UniProtKB/Swiss-Prot annotation:
Keywords: Calcium, Disulfide bond, Hydrolase, Lipid degradation, Lipid metabolism, Neurotoxin, Presynaptic neurotoxin, Secreted, Toxin. Snake venom phospholipase A2 (PLA2) that inhibits neuromuscular transmission by blocking acetylcholine release from the nerve termini and exhibits indirect hemolytic activity against human erythrocytes. PLA2 catalyzes the calcium-dependent hydrolysis of the 2-acyl groups in 3-sn-phosphoglycerides. The keyword Nucleus does not apply. This is Basic phospholipase A2 T1-2 A chain. Its EC number is 3.1.1.4. Belongs to the phospholipase A2 family. Group I subfamily.
Length: 14
């Protein structure tokens, strides 16, 4: 899921 991946990145780099 691309959504899950993007959510992980948004928490890594605000």
């Amino acid at each position: 899921n691309l959504y899950q991946f993007k959510e992980m990145i948004r928490y890594t780099i605000p």
